[in-house]
Amino acid sequence: MSMRDPQILDIEQVIKSKAGKNAKRIPKFVINWFKNFMHLDYINGFLKEGYVGVEFCENAIRYLGVELEVEGLENLPKDGRKYTFVSNHPLGAIDGVTLGAIIGREYDGKIRYLMNDLLMNLKGMAPLGIPINKLGGQARSLSKLINEVYSSDNQMIVFPAGLCSRNIDGKIQDLEWGKSFIKFSRLTGRDIVPIHFDGENSKRFYRVATWCKRLKLKFNFAMMLLPDEMYRSTGKKYKITIGKPIPVSEFDKSKSDHEWAQTVRSKVYDL
C-alpha cells in the first residue's frame, strides 16, 4: 500500500471563502456551530486516511457502513466505449460517492463528475470532479470545460437535476432535468446509461429546501446540510438499479434536447 497524503476539511476556510467581504463579520461561535453540526471530527477521521479518487469513494462507503444492493450490473457496457451514466440525485452526497465506487471499479477509475464547489473542497474527490460553482457564475468557461471532458476517455457520471431531489407535490423526486447531457453525449457519440438510486434525506432537509425556495434565498442553505445528511446515512442500505444503455441515435429532432432529457428522467424513475 502506497503512502497517502492525510487530508482535512477546513470548514472555516470554506465558509469564509463563500462569505467573501463579509467573512470578518461571521462570529466565531457560528463557525464552531457549523463544525459540530457538520460532524467535522467524524468526517476528518476518514479524510486523514488520505484516500483519493475511486479508492476514496469505495472506502467512504466502508467508513459509513453503508450496504448496497445493486441490480443490473450486467448492463454496464464492456465494449471499451465511453458512456454517459445519468442518475436521479436523491441524497446529494452519498449517492454520488456510491456511483463513483460502482462505476469507477468497473472502468479502472476513469470517471468524471460534474461536482459542486463544496465537494471540490474534499481533496479525495476533487481529482474526479469538474467544478460547478452553485454559488456563483461561470457559464462560458464551464461549457468549454464540459465539452473537453466529454471528449476525453473518461466515463461521465451526471446528475442532470443539478441539485439533489426535493419534495414536489408530496413526493421526493428530482427537479426538471437539464439538457446538457443530451447535447454533449450527442456531440461526442456517447450512449446513455440510466441509473436509479433509491433513497431519501431527512424531512428536515426538505423543509429547509422548501423555505429557501419560498423566501427566494440566493444562498443554498440546504446544501450546507448535506454533510449531516451523509452522516445520517451511516449503516443504511440503498438499492441502485442500472438500466440498459440508450443509443444516442435515439435523440433525434423529433423532440428538443430539453424534452429528451425529461424522457430519460422518466426512464430512470421507471427502473
Protein language model annotation of sequence segments:
Residues E71-L73, L114-N116, I132, G243-P245, ...:
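Conserved beta-strand termini and adjacent loop/short-helix elements that scaffold enzyme active sites
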Residues K21-N36, D41-K48, L122-K123, K203-G235:
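Alpha-helical membrane-targeting segments
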Residues N75-P77, L118-M120, G136, G199, ...:
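Residue-level detector of flexible, active-site-proximal loop/helix-junction positions
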Residues M1-Y83, G96-T98, A126:
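Membrane-anchoring hydrophobic helices of lipid-metabolizing enzymes
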Residues R4-Q7, L142-L271:
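Non-catalytic C-terminal accessory region of glycerolipid acyltransferases
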